[in-house]
Amino acid sequence: MKNFHVVLEAAWLVRDVKTADDAIGVAISEAGKRLNPKLDFVEVDVGTTSCPVCGEPFSSVFIAANTALVGLIFEMKVFDAESAEHAERIAKSVIGKSLRDVPLTVVEVTEFERSVEKGEQQQKGKANK
């Protein structure tokens, strides 16, 4: 079994905002309320979009008529998945249950090695003695 870091993207609608910073704050707050405290292992951040002209990255926020569309990024680690596709399905299922009616798109899936925690090292050291 392998471990994966899965990054998902969602479009979050925020009403009655005047600035991009307000929209970002409200979107992250609303998403966080839906995810926490059950899913405190999911990281929430604002996505970035590249400018089509100059290529510079900027926050994924679009405002029109005091309504904003904010691109949010959700990151989580999936342990003991059979494959990258399996990790994608697990992440979409876990996050999707809390964020009903919010479409999720997979941005990136990377495999990682599970590091041994200090407590586990001490336990192993005691077991070997």
From Swiss-Prot:
It holds the Pfam family DUF555. Transmembrane segments: none annotated. NCBIfam families: PRK03922.1 (NF003035). Belongs to the UPF0212 family. This is UPF0212 protein MM_2357. The lineage of its organism: Archaea, Methanobacteriati, Methanobacteriota, Stenosarchaea group, Methanomicrobia.
